[in-house]
UniProtKB/Swiss-Prot annotation:
Residues 276-350 form the PUA domain. It holds the Pfam family AA_kinase. GO terms for biological process: L-proline biosynthetic process. It catalyses: L-glutamate + ATP = L-glutamyl 5-phosphate + ADP. It is an enzyme of class 2 (transferase). The keyword Metal-binding does not apply. PROSITE patterns: GLUTAMATE_5_KINASE, PUA. Its EC number is 2.7.2.11. Catalyzes the transfer of a phosphate group to glutamate to form L-glutamate 5-phosphate. ATP binds at K9, T168, D169, T210, G211, G212, M213, K214, S215, K216. The gene is proB. Belongs to the glutamate 5-kinase family. Pathway: Amino-acid biosynthesis; L-proline biosynthesis; L-glutamate 5-semialdehyde from L-glutamate: step 1/2. It comes from Bacillus mycoides (strain KBAB4). This is Glutamate 5-kinase.
C-alpha cells in the first residue's frame, strides 16, 4: 500500500465513558490504531473532540453543560486533560504529538490560514502527529464546527489529505434510522453526497457530542469538494484504520478516488474569505472566465460596488445579477471604477499600471 496522508476525526461519543469523562480504554484503542497507520508509513493528522466531555465533571457539572459559558469553561479545563492523555499514550509508541487549537477566524484570515498550512506541513514532514481541536474556550460563536466534523473536512482539504475518516458511534449512513427501523438499509458506498442523501440525516447528536449525522454528511460534502475521499463509520482494535484503507471498514465510503485536489489559495477563496465588494461583468467576460478559464480584464467590467482594497475578495456577477464566482481583486474599488470598460492599450496610454488582470485565474473560483 502506497504512503498516504490520512486525517482521522474522533468525536466525543467515541471517546467518553458512560459518566461523560474520557474513557482511557477507548482513547488507548484509538491511539494504538493511529500508531499502526504511522507504522505502515502513512502521514496522520488527528482531529479530536472531547474537551468539553473531559472537563465538565471536574467543574462540578452533573452532565454536559448547555450554556456557552459552561461549555467554554469545561473546554478550558478539559483540553489540557485531553491533550495530556493523548500525549502519554502516543509516547508509548515513540510518536511526537503537536497541539493546534483553531477557530473560524483562523480560516477567514488568509495570513493565519497560510500559517496553519505551513505549520501542519512542517509537522508532517518531521513525522509528528498533529492533534487538532477547535479552540472552544475562546470561540466567539457557539462551538460552530459541529463536533469538529466541519473542522475535520476543512483541515483535510487544507493539507490535501487522501482520505478523511470520521469515526463515530454509528457504523455508517442508512436510508432510515436503524435504531427505529429494523429494515433500515446501510449505504456501503456513495459516489457523492446528493440532496436526497443529505435529507436522510437528523440534526441531533448524542448527549456527549454536538454533531449528529447531518453535520457529518455536510462535512463529507465539503471534503469531497476539496478533493478528499471520506469514510464515516466505527470500529475497534488496532487494525481498524488500516481496515478502512483496505476497503474493509465498518461504515460508508463516500467519493470515487482519486479526487481532484484544490489548491490551498483557492480553498481559502471559496470557503473562508470574506467578500468586500462586487464587480459586474459583461456577457463576453463571463463566458471567458467560466467556459475558457481566462482572467478577468478591466475591459469586461461594467460596474463596481463596495469599497474594497487591493487583494481583497469580491463577488463577480453578470448583468442579470447572477453570481458566477469570486476572487482576489488586484485593484482597489476606486482604481477599478476609473478603469472599468477600458482596453489594456488605453490604460497603458494613460500611464496607468496595465500589466495586472482585475482577477487572475489562479485567484478565482467559479460557482
Amino acid at each position: 500500500m502506497k504512503k498516504q496522508r490520512i486525517a482521522v476525526k474522533i468525536g466525543s461519543s467515541s471517546l467518553a465513558d458512560s459518566h461523560g469523562g474520557i474513557s482511557k480504554e477507548q482513547l488507548s484503542d484509538h491511539v494504538a490504531a493511529l500508531a499502526r497507520l504511522k507504522e505502515e508509513g502513512h502521514e496522520v493528522l488527528l482531529i479530536t473532540s472531547g474537551a468539553v466531555a473531559a472537563g465538565f465533571s471536574a467543574l462540578g457539572y452533573p452532565s454536559r453543560p448547555v450554556t456557552i459559558k459552561g461549555k467554554q469553561a469545561a473546554a478550558a479545563v478539559g483540553q489540557s486533560l485531553l491533550m495530556q492523555a493523548y500525549t502519554e499514550e502516543f509516547r508509548k509508541y515513540g510518536i511526537v504529538t503537536a497541539q493546534l487549537l483553531l477557530t473560524r477566524s483562523d480560516f477567514s484570515r488568509k495570513e493565519q490560514y497560510s500559517n496553519a498550512y505551513a505549520t501542519l506541513g512542517e509537522l508532517l514532514n518531521r513525522s509528528a502527529l498533529p492533534i487538532i481541536n477547535e479552540n472552544d474556550s475562546i470561540s466567539l460563536e457557539e462551538l460552530t464546527f459541529g463536533d469538529n466534523d466541519m473542522l475535520s473536512a476543512l483541515v483535510s482539504g487544507l493539507v490535501s489529505a487522501d482520505m478523511l475518516m470520521i469515526f463515530t458511534d454509528v457504523n455508517g449512513l442508512y436510508d432510515q434510522n436503524p435504531q427505529k427501523n429494523a429494515d433500515a438499509k446501510k449505504y456501503h458506498f456513495l459516489p457523492e453526497v446528493t440532496e436526497e442523501i443529505a435529507s436522510l440525516a437528523g440534526d441531533a447528536g448524542s448527549k456527549l457530542g454536538t454533531g449528529g449525522m447531518k453535520s457529518k454528511i455536510d462535512a463529507a460534502k465539503t471534503a469531497l469538494s476539496l478533493g478528499v475521499s471520506v469514510f464515516i463509520g466505527t470500529g475497534c482494535g488496532q487494525e481498524k484504520f488500516l481496515d478502512v484503507m483496505k476497503g474493509k471498514g465498518d461504515g460508508t465510503y463516500i467519493g470515487n478516488a482519486p479526487q481532484k485536489v484544490i489548491k490551498m489559495n483557492k480553498q481559502w477563496i471559496a470557503l473562508h474569505s470574506l467578500v468586500s465588494g462586487q464587480i459586474e461583468v459583461d456577457a463576453g467576460a463571463a463566458t471567458a472566465i467560466i467556459q475558457h478559464g481566462k482572467s478577468l480584464l478591466p475591459a469586461g467590467v461594467t460596474s463596481v460596488s463596495g469599497f474594497f482594497q487591493v487583494d481583497e475578495v469580491v463577488e463577480v456577477i453578470t448583468q442579470q445579477g447572477r453570481v458566477i464566482g469570486k476572487g482576489q481583486c488586484t485593484y482597489s474599488a476606486e482604481e477599478l471604477r476609473n478603469l472599468k470598460g477600458m482596453q489594456s492599450q488605453d490604460i497603458q496610454a494613460r500611464g496607468e499600471r496595465h500589466n495586472y488582470e482585475v482577477i487572475h485565474r489562479d485567484h478565482w473560483v467559479s460557482f
